[in-house]
């Protein structure tokens, strides 16, 4: 069973925390993580790109000049791809990029991502993060105490003051635990997570 240090938001160690093997100590499945990230990125695509082929460009029905005797290269239509305003070869058309991933694979992927962070000592567990008023410098101070630059902060219920304090810090993203996803966990160098959020993850994914 993995064990990690438990810190307060001042960066001081206040104890240890045992993590569930079934969530934070699984065999890392890189294939599952790759498939889920691929699907997440594909599902973000709008798929609205479009261009006209030579068949769809208006005009150009007549041959621009006669075949022989002009000294110029022969041309059949001003709609040909080599012409300015001509059609596009293999023109992109609107399409749906959506991919569906089984729930079981999503579960395996998120557990693998969290386990990889624990294995590499890139997960910091904090007992709680609370602020009386929005203060960005307090969150920056906390992250500096953990030597965390590009960081994902995960809370059980993101308090408004904490959210407002963290949202404008470059390279930092804060999300409630219900919005956790593989892409964000892998994208950021470090994960700073509250103790309550850990319990919630173990409850859902164990």
From Swiss-Prot:
GO terms of molecular function: rRNA binding; structural constituent of ribosome
Keywords for this protein: Ribonucleoprotein, Ribosomal protein, RNA-binding, rRNA-binding
Pfam families in UniProt: Ribosomal_L4
One GO-annotated biological process of the protein: translation
Family assignment from sequence similarity: Belongs to the universal ribosomal protein uL4 family.
Quaternary organization: Part of the 50S ribosomal subunit.
Function: One of the primary rRNA binding proteins, this protein initially binds near the 5'-end of the 23S rRNA. It is important during the early stages of 50S assembly. It makes multiple contacts with different domains of the 23S rRNA in the assembled 50S subunit and ribosome.
Protein name according to UniProt: Large ribosomal subunit protein uL4
The organism of origin for this protein: Clostridium botulinum (strain Hall / ATCC 3502 / NCTC 13319 / Type A)
Protein's gene: rplD
